[in-house]
């Protein structure tokens, strides 16, 4: 891949994704196999005005080794230096950039039960720091091809060709063309126009139907609004948290989901694929879940904590999105969630609530924004998916027909 194209992608991540501000600190999190591209992103951050760029290196094989060899108690412990680092982030609010390149199968063989217990044990310590930073800093998740990931996506190609093809797919779906920044400005404007229309309807609930058996109604929070593309921090900084993105999303009202929904794509979770699954909801809670493969893992996901059995997101993505048109299953939620409509179990987004900077976290939970240690997207979009809005004034308005926008 030409370095000029990769530098354009790095600039896109720094200037449009994270929207690094002059004088701001930046923290980049990446795997050890990506030093060249991480250097490009760091350089782009400095050019955007970053005061300091720090890289936190990860190595999936070491993470797997630690999970297998260390005790649950050791893994659950949040050391003093970790707390100090989290407090430093609260105090300085650095911009955060996450570069994904991990092997989708890299944690295969690790006990899901052990991982869940570790996550549960650490969550109580980390959550107060996370809550203090909520909505106050920019962040961006983007992707870089790792060899194992590329071979998973393109198993019949050589390693080099698989990486090249995955680069091509990432750059295409991220609109890295002759002028990617202009392309993203136009894309954000289109997504915002769709969100504005949806928000003008006064939606009380969304009703989903598809020939695969999906028959689900999800209630909306009156104070919530659809968001898409870029978003603002409480301080007014505009950024794009996901590259790519094709969704208009909203956090539904906890406790208001009735019916059943069927997946349309596999869910890659903890190094394993959950395939051909369904989830049935009563009074907002997932009360029944079945899957052709890894049903027990799906049920453990739903039982992770009190909030993991409730929905935290409804996202509208046309079935003919650029990502779905590639025909590629990326085995990575960042991409696969933008291939078609999806829902998410777990944590909702407080920034979907109108005037959220002037509300307390407790007020937004009381409105119905779900809280959980997890946020797991799963795809439900099909070529015949129909979504109908039931509005607070009594109107019934088509939102999706035949898998795509009805307006």
Where are these regions (language model features)?
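Dual-mode signal for accessory low-complexity, basic/Gly-rich regions
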Residues: 286-357
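Extended hydrophobic packing segments that form well-structured cores
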Residues: 362-407
């Amino acid at each position: 891949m030409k370095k000029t194209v990769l530098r354009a992608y790095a600039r896109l991540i720094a200037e449009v994704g994270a929207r690094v501000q002059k004088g701001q600190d930046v923290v980049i999190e990446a795997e050890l196999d990506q030093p060249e591209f991480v250097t490009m992103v760091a350089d782009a951050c400095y050019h955007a005005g970053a005061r300091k760029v720090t890289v936190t290196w990860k190595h999936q094989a070491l993470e797997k080794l630690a999970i297998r060899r260390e005790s649950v108690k050791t893994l659950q412990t949040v050391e003093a230096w970790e707390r100090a680092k989290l407090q430093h982030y609260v105090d300085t609010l650095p911009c955060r950039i996450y570069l994904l390149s991990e092997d989708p199968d890299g944690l295969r063989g690790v006990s899901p039960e052990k991982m869940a217990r570790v996550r549960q044990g650490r969550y109580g310590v980390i959550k107060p720091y996370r809550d203090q930073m909520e909505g106050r800093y920019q962040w961006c998740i983007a992707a870089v091809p790792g060899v194992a990931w590329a071979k998973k996506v393109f198993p019949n190609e050589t390693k080099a060709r698989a990486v090249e093809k995955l680069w091509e797919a990432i750059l295409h779906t991220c609109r890295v063309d002759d002028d990617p920044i202009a392309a993203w400005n136009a894309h954000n404007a289109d997504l915002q126009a769709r969100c504005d229309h949806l928000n003008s309807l006064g939606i009380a609930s969304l009703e989903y139907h598809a020939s695969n058996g999906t028959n689900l109604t999800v209630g909306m929070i009156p104070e919530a609004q659809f968001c898409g593309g870029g978003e603002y921090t409480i301080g007014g900084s505009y950024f794009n948290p996901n590259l790519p993105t094709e969704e208009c999303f909203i956090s539904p009202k906890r406790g208001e989901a009735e019916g059943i929904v069927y997946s349309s794509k596999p869910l890659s979770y903890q190094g394993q694929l959950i395939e051909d699954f369904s989830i049935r909801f009563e009074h907002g809670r997932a009360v029944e879940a079945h899957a052709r493969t890894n049903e027990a893992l799906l049920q453990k996901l739903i039982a992770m904590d009190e909030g993991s059995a409730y929905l935290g997101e409804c996202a509208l993505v046309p079935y003919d999105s650029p990502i779905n048109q590639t025909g590629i299953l990326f085995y990575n939620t960042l991409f696969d969630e933008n291939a078609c409509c999806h829902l998410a179990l777990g944590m909702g987004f407080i920034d979907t609530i109108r005037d959220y900077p002037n509300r307390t976290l407790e007020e937004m939970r009381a409105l119905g924004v779900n809280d959980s240690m997890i946020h797991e997207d799963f795809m439900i979009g099909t070529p015949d998916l129909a979504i109908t809005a039931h509005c607070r004034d009594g109107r019934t308005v088509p939102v999706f027909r035949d898998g795509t926008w009805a307006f």
